[in-house]
């Protein structure tokens, strides 16, 4: 009677216990079978599972526990995120591929690094030696020896349980009994020291959040300093270039909801600045065009002066030539009557002194080199109409045998009778 009452009191006490929320981590190398194990525990079919990128989360109910399992990716590049989940975990499920003996050393290094972390040391560890259905899979003792598991858990004071299993052998209620047994053991250890673990996890979670907030502030401060340095460099560059392109390239974010009057004033100011810039550009273009026209005018005037000077020199030469020609004509006219009178009177010839001051007129046409006459154009080359030529009369190569060959009329043309014609018809 007393034993029945004691058992009823124990059952009533357990029934009055509140539901406890527990967070577990499922880690291991890639392709170890973590996601298949988690799906089997949840009651889903564990085959055709894709590799986990990042993490996946499953929720399930086990007795008085609401269990949340974080399935973390096991790739070498993603193992660095494991430490971000250590603070809030009550225990760890480490899945090992017992059929891959070549990666046992890598598995040992990953497990050792995890157990050395201060936020994991002292928490219970469940090791699942998965893929026992494959040929050549290591047994429980071999896995313990390859991983030096006994040494690791004693060094870091972690309660440990190893279970050989196969995640794809069943799911839901038909899940592998070793997986179910190991999960019950892990929850039992957590329930036994739940208060101490809960206090430790609350403390470590607070520290983790404070550390994350501090890192976030440090990142924001680094970003702010980088932006300030970039802004300062842009200002210095704008001052060197003589332009203030900072406001245009990286404008400060403004409130989109502004009074319409301020928006209108701002737009009018922008339009005035644009008009002013356009006017300055036009003025600069006009000054440049004016300088160019003045330069061209000066060059044209200099060319005209040069041509005028040449024309003046040529005019002086022409005037001098005309004066010399007129003087020679006058002298010839004065000399002609004297010669006629001398011939008429038949006087003795007078000796005339040779005048040295006479100047021959300058004949520009004689001085200019005669332009050579261009050679006649070559006969056109190409197709053309041939000239009409009369060919000689053809003669026979030898004497004919008949003397009366030439001019003899041809005999009449004999037309043979055709059948069925009028001439061929004969009436008897």
Swiss-Prot record:
Post-translational modification (record): Sumoylation is required for PKD2 entry into cilium.
Family note: Belongs to the small GTPase superfamily. Arf family.
Basic and acidic residues composition bias: residue spans: 207-234, 267-287, 329-338, 392-407
Coiled-coil parts of chain: 192-245
UniProt-reported outcome of changing residue 143 to A: In JBTS8; likely pathogenic; leads to reduction in ciliary length; reduces cilium trafficking of INPP5E
CDD domains hit by this protein: Arl2l1_Arl13_like
Positions bearing the Glycyl lysine isopeptide (Lys-Gly) (interchain with G-Cter in SUMO) cross-link: 329
Subcellular location: Cell projection, Cilium membrane; Cell projection, Cilium; Cell membrane; Cytoplasm, Cytoskeleton
Keyword tags: Cell membrane, Cell projection, Ciliopathy, Cilium, Coiled coil, Cytoplasm, Cytoskeleton, Disease variant, GTP-binding, Isopeptide bond, Joubert syndrome, Lipoprotein, Membrane, Nucleotide-binding, Palmitate, Ubl conjugation
Effect of residue 279 to R: No effect. Abolishes sumoylation
Subunit structure: Monomer. Interacts with CIMAP3. Interacts with IFT complex B components IFT46 and IFT74. Interacts with EXOC2; regulates ARL13B localization to the cilium membrane. Interacts with actin; the interaction mediates colocalization of ARL13B and microtubules.
GO cellular component, one term: motile cilium
Miscellaneous section: Used as a ciliary marker because of its specific localization to microtubule doublets of the ciliary axoneme.
Tissue specificity note: Expressed in the developing brain.
Lipid sites, type S-palmitoyl cysteine: 8-9
Coiled coil found in the keyword field: yes
PANTHER family per the UniProt record, alphabetical: ADP-RIBOSYLATION FACTOR-LIKE PROTEIN 13B
Region feature (Disordered): 207-287, 318-428
Main function: Cilium-specific protein required to control the microtubule-based, ciliary axoneme structure. May act by maintaining the association between IFT subcomplexes A and B. Binds GTP but is not able to hydrolyze fit; the GTPase activity remains unclear. Required to pattern the neural tube. Involved in cerebral cortex development: required for the initial formation of a polarized radial glial scaffold, the first step in the construction of the cerebral cortex, by regulating ciliary signaling. Regulates the migration and placement of postmitotic interneurons in the developing cerebral cortex.
Protein name according to UniProt: ADP-ribosylation factor-like protein 13B
Entry domain remark: The C-terminal domain is required for localization to microtubules and the cell membrane.
Source species of the chain: Homo sapiens (Human)
């Amino acid at each position: 009677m007393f034993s029945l009452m004691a058992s009823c009191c124990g059952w009533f006490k357990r029934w009055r216990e509140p539901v406890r929320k527990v967070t577990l981590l499922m880690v291991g190398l890639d392709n170890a079978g973590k996601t298949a194990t988690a799906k089997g525990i949840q009651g889903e079919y564990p085959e055709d599972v894709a590799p986990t990128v990042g993490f996946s989360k499953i929720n399930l109910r086990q007795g008085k526990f609401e269990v949340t399992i974080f399935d973390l990716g096991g790739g070498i590049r993603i193992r660095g995120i494991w430490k971000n989940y250590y603070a809030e975990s009550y225990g760890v499920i480490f899945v090992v591929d017992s059929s891959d003996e070549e990666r046992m050393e890598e598995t040992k290094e990953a497990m050792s690094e995890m157990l050395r972390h201060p936020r994991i040391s002292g928490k219970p560890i469940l090791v699942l030696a998965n893929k026992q259905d494959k040929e050549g899979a290591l047994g429980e003792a071999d896995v313990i020896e390859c991983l030096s598991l006994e040494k690791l858990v004693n060094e870091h004071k972690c309660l440990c349980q190893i279970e050989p299993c196969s995640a794809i052998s069943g799911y839901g209620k038909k899940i592998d009994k070793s997986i179910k047994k190991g999960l019950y053991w892990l929850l039992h250890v957590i329930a036994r020291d739940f208060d101490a673990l809960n206090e430790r996890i609350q403390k470590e979670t607070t520290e983790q959040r404070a550390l994350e907030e501090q890192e976030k502030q440090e990142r924001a401060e680094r970003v702010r300093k980088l932006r300030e340095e970039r802004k300062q460099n842009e200002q210095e560059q704008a001052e060197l270039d003589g332009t203030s392109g900072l406001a245009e390239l990286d404008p400060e974010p403004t409130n989109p909801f502004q009074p319409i009057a301020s928006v209108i004033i701002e737009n009018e100011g922008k339009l005035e600045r644009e008009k002013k810039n356009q006017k300055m550009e036009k003025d600069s273009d006009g000054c440049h065009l004016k300088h160019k026209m003045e330069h061209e005018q000066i060059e044209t005037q200099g060319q005209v002066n040069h041509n005028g000077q040449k024309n003046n020199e040529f005019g002086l030469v022409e005037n001098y030539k005309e004066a010399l020609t007129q003087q020679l004509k006058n002298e010839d006219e004065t000399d002609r009557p004297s010669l006629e009178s001398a011939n008429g009177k038949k006087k003795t010839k007078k000796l005339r002194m040779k005048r040295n001051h006479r100047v021959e007129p300058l004949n520009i046409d004689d001085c200019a080199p005669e332009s050579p006459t261009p050679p006649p154009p070559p006969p056109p080359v190409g197709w053309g109409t041939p000239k009409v030529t009369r060919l000689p009369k053809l003669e026979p190569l030898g004497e004919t045998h008949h003397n009366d060959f030439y001019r003899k009329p041809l005999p009449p043309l004999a037309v043979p009778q055709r059948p069925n014609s009028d001439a061929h018809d004969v009436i008897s």
